[in-house]
Design a protein with these regions (language model features):
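The feature captures the beta-strand-to-loop junction immediately N-terminal to the Walker
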Residues: 33-35
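Helix-to-loop junction immediately C-terminal to a conserved catalytic motif
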Residues: 48
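Conserved ABC transporter NBD signature motif
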Residues: 56-64, 73
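Conserved ABC ATPase "signature" region
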Residues: 96, 111-129, 154
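Conserved ABC ATPase signature
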Residues: 108, 133-137
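Catalytic Walker B motif of ABC-type/P-loop ATPase nucleotide-binding domains
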Residues: 158-162
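ABC ATPase nucleotide-binding domains
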Residues: 231-251
Length: 251
């Protein structure tokens, strides 16, 4: 589990996060919500050590993040950024990169590493893409490949920055279903999301940021009931109870 305690973070001359206390819990999908520029991506980058904190604590299974090596962090936390380069390699080779934290120098992949790639691609429903160049794949197909890479990393916490952006509705639902499966397998899944109804339907908990501070945190029902979403976004988010549970929409 990752714990953020009174976290402060930002960039030279530009503080972003202030006094954020939050937990990424195993077995749960956490949606990180908030307007553009409120610090969502900064939160994820600080939580896995890509961006140094300026105050507070980041604890990984009770251990301060700065006390872990880069390899140890990578074995604990997988991170899928919003923007990624598209290297001139096959999808299978890209997924194999998830095994880097477990290799010694010089890097030599073992039979079990290749088997893990096969299983991960099968898990995300992309086994047929293994030999195809990454550059030839659609956005939805690439998203599956990146998720498979994160699975081969075997990290108990998965951070995803806007994984549904630019995907059609069907692919968005596939990503959310995959997040749910991962949580059911015991992982902590943290997703920065812009689609509020999608987030509220698909997540267990929600963390709402506003101007770098935590405006609300709790179950999606608790955050909805707080009225903070309407205040922060300036929209009217409503819900209706159906046979399949609460459905959210803009009123």
């Amino acid at each position: 589990m990752i714990q953020l305690k009174n976290l402060r973070a930002g960039y030279p001359g530009r503080p972003v996060l202030e006094d954020v206390t939050l937990e990424f819990r195993p077995g749960e999908v956490l949606a990180v919500l908030g307007p553009n520029g409120c610090g969502k991506s900064t939160l994820l980058r600080t939580a896995n050590g890509l961006l140094p904190k300026t105050g507070g604590e980041v604890l990984v299974d009770g251990v301060p993040l700065e006390g872990l090596s880069a390899k140890e962090v990578a074995q604990k936390v997988a991170y899928l950024p919003q923007s990624r380069s598209v290297p001139n390699i096959t999808a299978g080779r890209m997924v194999l990169h998830g095994r880097f934290p477990y290799l010694s120098y010089p890097r030599r992949y073992r039979r079990e590493d290749h088997e893990m790639v096969r299983r991960a691609l099968d898990w995300v429903g992309a086994a047929e893409l293994a030999s195809r160049p990454l550059a030839e794949l659609s956005g939805g197909q690439r998203q599956k490949v990146y998720l498979a890479m994160a699975l081969t990393q075997e990290a108990p916490t998965l951070l995803m920055d806007e994984p549904t952006t630019f995907l059609d509705v069907g692919r968005q639902l596939e990503v959310m279903a995959a997040a749910r499966r991962l949580a059911q397998e015991g992982r902590a899944v943290v997703m920065v999301l812009h689609d509020l109804p999608l987030a509220m339907r698909g997540a267990d908990d929600a963390a709402l940021l506003s101007h770098g501070r935590l405006a609300a945190w709790g179950t999606v029902e608790e955050v909805y009931a707080s009225g903070k979403i309407d205040q922060v976004f300036g929209v009217a988010l409503r819900r209706v109870e159906t046979r399949s549970g609460w459905q959210y929409y803009y009123g």
